[in-house]
Design a protein with these regions (language model features):
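Short, charged, surface-exposed hinge/linker loops at domain edges
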Residues: 1-3, 37-73
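Short aromatic-glycine-(Arg/Gly/Cys) micro-motifs in beta-strand/loop hairpins
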Residues: 7-22
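Intrinsically disordered, low-complexity regions
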Residues: 14-15, 30, 55
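Flexible, active-site-adjacent loop/turn segments at secondary-structure boundaries
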Residues: 20, 24, 55-57
């Protein structure tokens, strides 16, 4: 399965990663690469728990997250 993740750099260093379609599925890492590896494992565990509980696993619709820069005056 493929999921969109949001990777955010923390002010004090490191990165936090969330998965919008999987509420509460969050991970972190000291580097981007570590954070992304960690979220892959978190997603796998999240889905395993859902299946064990008899819940259906969300399938993400095709989405695009686009960043827009604006000038505020």
């Amino acid at each position: 399965m493929r999921y969109t993740v949001i990777l955010q750099k923390e002010d004090d260093g490191g990165y936090v990663v969330t998965v919008p379609v999987l509420p509460g599925c969050v991970s972190q890492g000291d580097t981007r690469e570590e954070a992304l590896r960690n979220i892959e494992e978190a997603i796998e565990l999240y889905i395993e728990d859902m299946r064990a509980a008899g819940e259906s696993v969300p399938v993400e619709d095709e989405r695009a997250y686009v960043e827009v820069n604006t000038l505020v005056r």
